[in-house]
Amino acid sequence: MARRSQSSSQGDNPLAPGYLPPHYKEYYRLAVDALAEGGSEAYSRFLATEGAPDFLCPEELEHVSRHLRPPQYVTREPPEGSLLDVDMDGSSGTYWPVNSDQAVPELDLGWPLTFGFQGTEVTTLVQPPPPDSPSIKDEARRMIRSAQQVVAVVMDMFTDVDLLSEVLEAAARRVPVYILLDEMNAQHFLDMADKCRVNLQHVDFLRVRTVAGPTYYCRTGKSFKGHVKEKFLLVDCAVVMSGSYSFMWSFEKIHRSLAHVFQGELVSSFDEEFRILFAQSEPLVPSAAALARMDAYALAPYAGAGPLVGVPGVGAPTPFSFPKRAHLLFPPPREEGLGFPSFLDPDRHFLSAFRREEPPRMPGGALEPHAGLRPLSRRLEAEAGPAGELAGARGFFQARHLEMDAFKRHSFATEGAGAVENFAAARQVSRQTFLSHGDDFRFQTSHFHRDQLYQQQYQWDPQLTPARPQGLFEKLRGGRAGFADPDDFTLGAGPRFPELGPDGHQRLDYVPSSASREVRHGSDPAFAPGPRGLEPSGAPRPNLTQRFPCQAAARPGPDPAPEAEPERRGGPEGRAGLRRWRLASYLSGCHGEDGGDDGLPAPMEAEAYEDDVLAPGGRAPAGDLLPSAFRVPAAFPTKVPVPGPGSGGNGPEREGPEEPGLAKQDSFRSRLNPLVQRSSRLRSSLIFSTSQAEGAAGAAAATEKVQLLHKEQTVSETLGPGGEAVRSAASTKVAELLEKYKGPARDPGGGAGAITVASHSKAVVSQAWREEVAAPGAVGGERRSLESCLLDLRDSFAQQLHQEAERQPGAASLTAAQLLDTLGRSGSDRLPSRFLSAQSHSTSPQGLDSPLPLEGSGAHQVLHNESKGSPTSAYPERKGSPTPGFSTRRGSPTTGFIEQKGSPTSAYPERRGSPVPPVPERRSSPVPPVPERRGSLTLTISGESPKAGPAEEGPSGPMEVLRKGSLRLRQLLSPKGERRMEDEGGFPVPQENGQPESPRRLSLGQGDSTEAATEERGPRARLSSATANALYSSNLRDDTKAILEQISAHGQKHRAVPAPSPGPTHNSPELGRPPAAGVLAPDMSDKDKCSAIFRSDSLGTQGRLSRTLPASAEERDRLLRRMESMRKEKRVYSRFEVFCKKEEASSPGAGEGPAEEGTRDSKVGKFVPKILGTFKSKK
């Protein structure tokens, strides 16, 4: 078929607007035929005859005349067995003779495949260059030096020795170099190589071929070809330089030229053009003389550092006289038997006298290449000898290549068994990987299968590495996970080149911008692979005081097993639980600050925070922010008690709990740590910083849960049969009741709630506690156990009140003794015996030498140890407990923890380095004056039986009142505002006043002991941060949080005002006396009395650490109204407004009996502060 130039009008529509008339003229063809047959004279005669102008210049006439070739007759090279052609004129009669059936040459060294481009960029370069621009030659050299995959050159004339040196350098780096030269000017390139003494036949990564211009065929069969005027340099199929610049000295110095540097999609056209030209190319065949000279170069010995040193008649060095790299262009002798020329090893003759020639030896053979280099490995194994060493001189050559890696500045190049790692290949792989990400030239690429072949086949020659700065490789080593630490590299432990997949392809190993454990595996340790805390060598958990991983904290015992993330539990039960959690966080934030006892629903276990703020991955467990109904508490090991000689001695057991370990901090009252904020999605909205004002108080937060446990245990203690102290216990049934109670107040019945996760979780942790009693425990984990037990006891008491109220709807009253007896009988055998062996020993309150009867089967009861200034909490053990009891009297035959005298520790002793200050001794150090709180309804241990008169005088309320009151009971038990003070008077104190030993019974005391004050001085700030904790963990909108923050700040101002302190209460003889008959208000209902009994501990010691209740009900109402006005219709949970309005409407009737439910709800929340004020006035 005719070419486009021979039928220029084909397919054109003459009526089209852009129609271009054909330019072909017949006399052009006839004139050229005349020129080919008769010469220039015949050409001139034909033009004169036709009357046409001359269309060929003298140079063109000379070119046609010089390169005209006669047709190739068949008789000259007759094929074997073919007949002779009788037509001897050779004329084809056509313009398109027979197509060639020869095979197309392949890009045998490989060719990158482009998959996409990122934009297009064109840069124009001129020669001579402007002052602020690089020259075209310098840019070409820079491009060749940056080549990693291929260098393709199409040039009409290549005689620049500097560019030849750059090309050979690239070939020495195993970068394929393809050079297509004009067929007519290729001899000049051979002459240049001859002058530089370069044997082109021995350069493995260099392919030089020739391309001719299009062939023009005449009528008689004669033909001539043109020149190749295409000039471009293609590097890695990513960047192209094209223009009028030729690789000649004259173009650098005297000619003006223009060149463009293309990046992006424009490169694809050059890529295609080069492959087309290469398919039409012919091999470069030097002349016979040139071949003879090249062979002489190959056999001539290399003598000297200069290229022409030792050559007779030559005294000046050539442009390649580089001292170290002269042999690049002048190969050494061939008698070494090398498979490829030694010029590929630039350092072969450099410091050769100081180099070992033996190959490195390693277990399993000479080399252990990666799976991606299997073709090379098979070839090396074929060449290896029986002993696994590479045979012949080639083995020494490879060994020297590997050894020279030790000279390079790779910090872990030679770690392991010798210099086996080939970081030259690693750098090559890394550069290719980064190029595939588009870091340098903004393109993506992968290797063609032939490219894989040469990359794998020659991967083990380290000296073919680029001489450029190793910026890409440094980026790889610095940030990518492909190259791990040197410690992770062991022989046979896995591939050393992670970027290379098993099939040799580049495997992308993308690492996110934040490669921390929580980003890859989520914020919950249960979904992360391999918790370190469960392993024997696992690092201990960090906390807020450990800013860096190097600040390790000793933790005696394994970390708890990770639990499933509660937020991911699907189903309506999980959704309802999360909803109740959000409501609880809202209420705890709204009303815990100032309106803690305004009748609003209380925070649902908002204080149940973990002491260890950060999980093994540097974040808090997601379940810590949830109420216990949605947590599955993990089992924590305990401290096993050891026998000791006495109670007050300095036994070795005391040193165990005081080992430096996890510093206890309040979870959110201290400065927020970014690691904490990353712990979960729900904690990411912590926007308040109101807790900063309580930094000093937050330091004492470590023993808060101990105080809570003391208070709860003391309340639930009562007299059992035989005169022994029987203590109530929590159980899984209590957990079920708690879950029913935890439901919103819209379920007044509350008696048939569905069993939720709480029952299962509490049963699990109870069983785990029983199993781990004897295990050597971690003191850091015991605080969490106390917290869960506290929740159990508190919930059990609340639900027992509810059940008693429903079983006895017509009862006139519920005395404190009746309630406590019921609690003690209901679940006395269900508690795990964890705390019997957990921390301390119980103390008999009557004498120093009278041992306390060991009672119960593992109740979580807490008694203060008062043996000679040892203000430590005690856990008395019941009869039948699987663990030894705890008796701390001198001469006590029972085993127990031996507390040091004056040891300022609570039941959970503070660790060294803990931010919690030590608690001063009870009798050896002065204590700030504490109000005696006669009316605080504090339950203290006394030798006398309580007077039940005031509790029995109240009128009986209707059943509905009791039901609704029980739903609000938790609010009264642990409101936010009061929990800040619960630890102040919460420790039941066995008196050491010399009272006769008698069966101990809980009674309504007029005040707290001094020990309770001193014990709780350090732990007291734990509960003080409850409101801020709930605010921080709330899941509300930002506008509501801003309102709550203001109210919280206002509440802190109130807390900063110290309460009046009537006088010191050191060893007051009134501490153990029961209250008078009229202590309780006569108009209190049964529910209020029960609530007051249960809350007695939390309402005491108001002056401790400058904590007081809000000033008055009017102040709280004012704050609530202020909050409502600030919302401006931005209600988050409108259902809670009902409670606020109820309290506003019913606040005046605090001293009256229960008349209606709305009024009753209001009274429940406001009785206790008024009663407290009454008691204070009586004091």
UniProtKB/Swiss-Prot annotation:
| Modification type Phosphoserine: residues | 513-514, 516, 523, 647, 667, 759, 785, 813, 870, 881, 892, 903, 914, 925, 936, 945, 1003, 1009, 1024-1025, 1048, 1068, 1147
Which keywords annotate this record?
A: Amelogenesis imperfecta, Biomineralization, Cytoplasm, Cytoskeleton, Disease variant, Phosphoprotein
InterPro entries, alphabetized: FAM83 (IPR050944), PLDc_FAM83H_N (IPR041996), SACK1 (IPR012461)
- Tell me which Gene Ontology terms the entry assigns under biological process: biomineral tissue development; intermediate filament cytoskeleton organization; positive regulation of cell migration; protein localization to cytoskeleton; signal transduction
Instruction: Provide the disease association from the record.
Output: Amelogenesis imperfecta 3A: An autosomal dominant hypomineralized form of amelogenesis imperfecta, a defect of enamel formation. AI3A is characterized by enamel of normal thickness but soft and with cheesy consistency. Enamel is lost from tooth soon after eruption.
Say which family it is in.
Belongs to the FAM83 family.
Q: What is known of its domains?
A: All members of the FAM83 family of proteins share a conserved N-terminal DUF1669 (domain of unknown function 1669) domain of about 300 amino acids. This domain mediates the interaction with casein kinase 1 (CK1) isoforms. Therefore, it has been proposed to rename DUF1669 the polypeptide anchor of CK1 domain.
- Name this polypeptide is given: Protein FAM83H
